[in-house]
From Swiss-Prot:
This is Isocitrate dehydrogenase kinase/phosphatase. Residues 593-612 are annotated as: Disordered. The active site is at 383. ATP binds at residues 327-333, 348. GO terms for biological process: glucose metabolic process; glyoxylate cycle; tricarboxylic acid cycle. GO terms for cellular component: cytoplasm.
Amino acid sequence: MNHFPKLLSSQIGFDLAQTMLEGFDRHYRIFRDAAIHAKTLFEKGDWHGLQKLARDRITSYDERVDECVELLEDEYDAEKIDSEVWQQIKLHYIGLLTTHRQPECAETFFNSVCCKILHRSYFNNDFIFVRPAISTEYIENDEPAAKPTYRAYYPGKDGLAATLERIVTNFQLEPQFEDLTRDVGCVMQAIHDAFGAFDEAPNFQIHVLSSLFYRNKSAYIVGRIINGDLLLPFAVPLRHVKPGVLALDTVLLKREQLLIIFSFSHSYFLVDMEVPSAYVEFLGTIMPGKPKAEIYTSVGLQKQGKNLFYRDLLHHLSHSSDQFIIAPGIKGLVMLVFTLPSFPYVFKLIKDNFPPPKETTRAQIQSKYQLVKRHDRLGRMADTLEYSSVALPRSRLDDALVRELEKEVPSLLEYEGENLVIRHMYIERRMVPLNLFLQNGNDEDVEHGIKEYGNAVKELMQANIFPGDMLYKNFGVTRHGRVVFYDYDEIEYLTDCNVRAVPAPRNEEDEMSGEPWYSVGPHDIFPETYGTFLLGDPRVRRSFMQHHADFFDPALWQRHKDHLLKGELPDFFPYDDSARFCNCYPERFADAAGRASPEPDAPADARSVRVA
């Protein structure tokens, strides 16, 4: 039943709605300014500046919400406004959004502000946006004609090489390219190698999103090729080959490759979008099946992603009947983890008490999760969604899970009618725990898992992350076969750690002792000792020593620490090194620096490529 008033008579209701929308508009203006500034930082090669910009943007949303709440409380005494006025506030807000370019994000901002002011019992359809009120279909861009949401190119007129070159130059990047003709030839060769020669259909065209996607040391051109009924996704990373000189590093042509660069284990892109829903819709066409919640999150609108995820969860609960259960695997000392088998996520709660040897607090653990949220995750640390006051139907909770919840996290529980309200939780993508993957896998699986594990830890080292607890159970294997770290309660900056070699035993008694015969400080790490708990399985040992024998050498860890202390930032590639043009077409890069006249665009067979 609709309880909304027939007439909107409250001036205060309109004023509050307008104040809240002004708060959102300020937030989104700052959000876009960050993406615009990312272009300048990328052009200058200011990688530390880009890192700081990405970190600061993550906290910007909550800061704008708090500003808006404070303003509403100071000017309107918002907590004392009665329910009839709150109903009108929402209706006025809907009216103000009818021509807005980011209505879905503005609705989420409204919810965030309301949930700071109102008690949970008021979170109902009348007061907040449980479902979207404004459609995001066919929202038009207000930008100049030079920057629509995406540009369409028609290679039939000027040829594919000229079209590809125009696509790149239209982004008007300040640095020069080392050899754009060479790089375009590599793109054409890669397309030919992947798909062969195709006939052009009458609708043959290339669509390219008008903004670059910035992350780490790369800027990505993202688009799709249309030919007949076929749609081919692509992404082209641009990188500095030396200060002030750019090159196209590769072209990613497989959906799986794009899913990895847009995955939950990577940091959010910096990308300028006037109409975010149009970008999300476009990205959905090149990554079909990827939830909109994850796409919004990957482009930096994590609060909108979080909102959509919760709606997806509620929708799934209403169309499923299985029960939440304790997650399979070894139970953690710090976190209680449960899952819904039909839903590909896990729910993680910080326990009330931690048995020895754990020495930590709830606040410290939450700070570790916030550290990961703000850090560059490099595709090796799982992103988390943090929620408060999540109501789950008691009937959907397995009895064993309820007993575990009441035993381990009673302070987080509140029964409310037929629901169990959980005061705080983290939600992550469900992965196969690495220990189970290794335990149940064949020899090929074990080799892959160990190779990935070593790569993951080494990349975390380079990103200044020391995992702390490196047992296999704290890592997971994604659906793409990548190993990702997801247990953060002991995480530290590598630069805060003291890398040490194990001192030689002083005598036979030391050598036979089960306890260290040397002093161990709180931040001391001893890589030589890790083999004790990592190499028990002969298959694991064989693969480990084949691919990562240096893992247990303190010099490796110290070398990474020294590079970090010097302010050096290594290169990371969220795709196989073999896919880089300099590796798959090395003949094109011979004497690149000194070559005066570039080679032709492509070999004869590639010049006549017809894209499908």
